Amino acid sequence: MRRLLPVSVLFVLALATSFVPTHAQNRLQPVSAMTGRPALELALRTLDTVGNVMMTTAHPDDENNALLAYYGHTKGFRTSLVTATRGEGGQNEIGPELFEALAVLRTEELAAVHKFDGAEQYFTRAVDFGYSFSVEETLAKWGKQEILGDYVRMIRIIRPDVIVGFVFDGEGGGQHHQTSSRLTAEAFRAAADPAAFPDQIKTGLKPWQPKKFYYTAGFGGPQGRGQALQGDGASSLFSFTGGESYDPLLGRTCNEIAGEARSMHKCQGMSQLLPLPGVSEGFGPPGGPRGYRLRDTVLPGGVNRPDAEMFDGVDTSLAGLVAYAGASPPAGLTAGLSRIVSAVADARAAVAARGSNAAVGPLANGLKAVRALQGDLGGMGLAEMAKYEIDLRLAQKVTQFEQTLVLAADVRLDAVANDGLVVGGQPVQVQIIAANRGDASVSLGGSLSGFTSATGDCVTATLAPKGARNCKMTAIVPVNARLTAAHFKYATDAARFILDPDVPPGLPFRLTPFVATVALTIGGEAASILVPVASRSEGNLYSGEKRAEMHVVPKFAVSATPEIVIVPASGGPRAARDVRVTVVNHSTGAATADVALQTPQGWRATPATHAVTFSREDEAATVKFTLSPPAPAALVAQVKLGGSRLTVSAVVREGGVTYAQGYQVVEYPHTTRRHVLRAPEVMVSVLDLKVKPNLTVGYVMGVGDDVPQALEQLGARAELLSEDQLAFGDLSRYEVIMTGVRAYERRADLRAYNQRLLDYARAGGTVVVNYNKFEFNEAQYGPYPGKVSSRRVTDENSTVRVLVPQHPVFTTPNKITEADWREWRQERGTYFFDKADPQYTDLVEFTEPFPYNQGPKLGALVEAKVGSGRWLYLGIGLWRQLPAGTDGAYRLMANILSLGGTAAPARPAPTPRGGR
């Protein structure tokens, strides 16, 4: 049976990340980057309180950062965010990451967020399968019992006093939000029931009953200009105003911190202007703070309690731990807690009177008192659960006191390696660095974990005031070290992740095994500080120094492109395709290896192998193979036997060892480097597909998508258009000009020279516009008046009705049938065209079954005749379907491309627009 890590260990691991320095950002001030006296005073706020608030949401960016910052920084409470999904079903406005890679990016963005609001981050196993209009659909895809169990587990681990959910009711879209809140409400009671999810109890978790559950009731207050405050009218409602008060230690309001935190959700377009005092205070629309309604409580008075604050009725003081002992607590418990509280008060007074170093003595006394009380608990005659609850919180206080003591002593600790990408068996030079900026000597020594061996001089020694010590150690990475990558992968039968069983539940990522433990003695008390071993890099011009954990990578990292190859079922010489394989040498010296493709039966790769030679570490080589299908008759027979989708794999062989693993790097200036493991595979899709020959497409890249590669697979030549080409290039040489995802938001040159595209269409060209959001509505970029809406169709299996069956999009050169609308992924499309001039013609209509999105939906595929040419808007999500290998999407795109160079027919009769 798998055992969970003790709750106290998870708490220590969560706090350990605070010792990893963060990079600077323009005009932003991460609270985690605070040092010296401000950091000390912030830490002192945590020592005499045990307040604990958990927030639950559906996706990254749903959280109220002001509330987390207020309770975490201003009040000193423990704050945690449990996010149901990692947001992998959303869009990406800064790069090409989708699906699993987007999950990694958005998880890292939350880590960047918490450098401001200070919360711990946890997740359930739920997958963001895309926008949903149905709680029932969400529960069915997630698995109600599985995700409910995840919430129960996190409540039992974190043991919050107050839980804050997101929206509970509402008939709008995004029903993941309502689902997560309803599951949280059920978990609020279930976590206290030992009969609920008994397997968790068997692994060592204890039941826990939180005291209050709130949910978001809207924005703006009763007179606010934002969304009206909502609720059932039968429970108490208050507006959270804690974010509006100025915190002199932070130098900002918590609302201002929240604005900085929220700007880290950059892939969701939230890198907006920061709030200014009196201009845009609070989370959400201007006009007021967020409202919360009490949904459930175990406190007297029930949900009608006239509370003005979330923690009204909850004793959050450290001294209040005596309540676990019942009506007559042991005198030793009361006295022990009193000594700890007094030591904290003495430390605050010392800092105020004489500065940081003056707090060392009181803090050492406080740490000693915590440890003494821990040791005495067993002899106090406490009930088992009382002892458990008190001891758990005292263990957390030990960690907090140790870290605060280091701050008071003005000791800085670092652990850095000379290589950030390592392979099994590699020696690494690690430096454990300590600087004593205080006015008293400290004793310290260091050790490394996660390595096979570590040699060097880091024995315990005295570090004098104003001195520094650099312990240089040689460590060996284990030969069979696990490759560094996300510990979650998609389940095949549900919208859930499967987690590696050795990773503690809920963690954002697997914790690095490479850790330095620094043992200090400060003021006569021992402190043990965990410092993850990091590598340093210069980043780019804007990010400066960046740090990341050490990544274990394959000796030879292998990748293959393109990821998808489209082969016409007719076969023949034109069906041969090029496959490129890139090999990166991560060994520390020269190396030679052979590269080959593993092909399905009857397929041939030419040449059979390529030899690659490397002279140094991090050198790369790319080789090309020609992939040829079997003869046409054999290819047709293979397809009939179900072989329309095949896999070609790249392998590297050296000395009898085979390497067949690569990775995708996910990193931006505001995030830490992460790897997503990728098998070097090419999916070969054999399709009954034709496309007009010799097509050249001018592509205006937007936020980053994989559509150009898909166009190349269809046989078109895709050229990325530069600003100069948009401004004065010869556009007439393109049969089609296509704008990428969100191009009108990303490309100022496209907005500036949009008239050139309309003139191109008027002269007989075909313009295809992939989906945009509301930035498209800032001017008339289409040939006639029309706007983008938030309308979407989320059911990937929704009913399809072709409105103009004779249109070449559905007939030429490929006949689009019902089969082409099957096996779509996640959705039909989003941000459909709306409020359109009658000159626009809808070509297709979707209908999905969900009550909150019923009725036919137009605007997914819209065409307008412009002069002798065409202008098309694609709300239909081909940009998502093409990288996913959806067959029908390729056939439909082939027809859209084949419109190029053909005159637009007279506009058909307008479609009734009642479905909009």
Give, region by region, the residue ranges found by the protein language model:
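Proline/serine/threonine-rich low-complexity linkers at boundaries of modular beta-sandwich domains
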Residues: 400-412, 547-557
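Aromatic-Pro/Gly-enriched surface loop or interdomain linker
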Residues: 658-740, 771-773, 880, 898-915
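Active-site beta-strand->loop->alpha-helix modules in alpha/beta enzyme cores, enriched
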Residues: 25-198, 219-220
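Extracellular ligand-binding/catalytic regions of CAZymes and related secreted enzymes
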Residues: 391-395, 542, 546-587, 593-595, ...
